[in-house]
A protein has these predicted regions:
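A short loop-to-beta-strand structural motif that recurs across blades of beta-propeller domains
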Residues: 89-92, 133-135, 187-190, 230-232, ...
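Blade-level signature of beta-propeller repeat domains, shared across WD40, Kelch, NHL, RCC1
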Residues: 305-346
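Asp-box/WD-like beta-propeller blade repeats and closely related beta-sheet repeat scaffolds
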Residues: 131-167, 172-179
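Conserved beta-strand positions in repeat-built beta-propeller and related beta-rich domains
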Residues: 73, 77-86, 124-130, 170-183, ...
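Short loop/turn segments that connect beta-strands within beta-propeller blades
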Residues: 94-99, 138-142, 192-197, 235-240, ...
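A short helix->beta-strand "capping" segment at the edge of beta-propeller domains
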Residues: 39-63, 246
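Secretory targeting and sorting signals
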Residues: 1-35
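Beta-rich, blade/repeat-based domains predominating
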Residues: 60-76, 88-89, 107-125, 151-170, ...
Length: 346
């Protein structure tokens, strides 16, 4: 996620996040099959179907931005609203069967940009982009605690997305520099130990990294560089404490739009979310463009971002968070392969 948009919307969202920071923050069915047709570049064009409207534009912040879709152990979908003001729901639950929406958690300070359940303690971890913290709550929104806060190697963080390894250690994209020119690269990828909360910088001087997800076999990371519209592959050492090799894996020709969060399915395919257009782009592990998933044409005018996607574990039921002037929505489609941990939050 990035809390701003291309053009005029970028300014509005940046102001909304600044306002949060100044106040202490910064009839149901499972996912239906999407319609599809061949695209010009060989990837299929798929149309997602509206599941439910989750939020409306907040008067105080001037926008709403849904992010961080993730399923809990009981199969319930949770999302975060990045720009929700103090006191309004910042974590919400969406019943994909009844399409009912209910509040889970709020506070007076956080601007939460992603969410994922830890395999270590089954708590929901939230990245507070404005506050530079990583908080956690129970699946019911209780016992709010701060897992990590403060500087890393002398510099504050803008924690954006997160991913857990199989042991529960956390890997975070630090989007420092997101609001500046790409050549002033200050972003990082940071590993945080599950037991000690000790932070280690794995990569630095990056152009505002955003999406982060493990490969299907947990041997490496996919990292989306928001400031470069590029996805990098990082091969990790055996215990995941160092990057052994890295390379640019694919480039996104997005024009004024930029890449956002990343999810990975059981076949290793990358679902690349986008800030600036309401579509998800799907690539093979070798960089082949397999599919583009968009909202219906009559809905696209009032929606400018599809910032994240989750696939229900063990199924191909996929749900993407879509936001814009019309509000915050969840759309559903059929994924190309089954969901795994790497496509469930972050």
């Amino acid at each position: 996620m990035e809390p701003h948009c291309p053009g005029p919307r970028r300014t509005v969202a940046a102001r909304a996040l600044a306002a949060l920071a100044l106040t202490g923050a910064a009839a149901g069915c499972a996912a239906p099959a999407a319609t599809s047709e061949d695209g010009e570049d060989g990837g299929t064009e798929r149309t997602a179907e509206l599941l439910v409207q989750v939020t409306s534009v907040h008067e105080e912040t001037g926008m709403t931005l849904l992010e961080g879709p993730t399923f809990d152990a009981d199969g319930r979908l949770l999302v975060v609203d990045v720009t929700a003001p103090a006191g309004e729901p910042k974590v919400l639950r969406v019943d994909t069967g009844s399409r009912e929406v209910s509040p889970v958690f709020t506070d007076g300070t956080g601007a939460y940009t992603s969410a994922q359940f830890s395999p270590h303690d089954d708590r929901l971890y939230l990245t507070d982009f404005a506050g530079g913290r990583i908080d956690s709550i129970t699946p019911e929104g209780e016992d709010h605690t701060t897992f990590f806060s403060g500087e890393v190697d002398g510099a504050p963080m803008n924690p954006d997305d997160l991913a857990f390894d199989e042991a529960g250690n956390m890997y975070v994209s630090d989007s420092a520099g997101f609001d500046g020119p790409a050549w002033e690269a200050r972003g990082r990828v940071v590993r945080i130990d599950r037991d000690t909360a000790e932070a280690t910088v794995l990569a630095e001087e990056l152009p505002a990294p955003n999406g982060i997800s493990f490969t299907a076999d947990f041997s490496g990371l996919w990292v989306g560089q928001y400031g470069a519209n590029r996805v990098d592959h990082y091969a990790l050492n055996e215990d995941g404490t160092e990057v052994e090799t890295s390379h640019a894996a694919l480039y996104f020709d997005g024009g004024t739009s930029r890449i956002d969060s990343i999810a990975v399915d059981a076949d290793g395919n990358l679902y690349q979310a986008v800030h600036g257009q309401p579509r998800i782009f799907v690539y093979s592990p070798l960089g082949e463009h397999l599919a583009t998933v968009g909202v219906p044409a009559d809905a696209a005018e009032g929606l400018y971002s599809a910032t994240n996607v989750a696939i229900a574990p063990g199924t191909t039921d996929a749900y993407m968070t879509v936001s814009g002037d019309d509000g915050g929505f969840v759309y559903s489609f059929d994924a190309l392969a089954e969901g795994i941990r790497q496509s469930n939050g972050g």
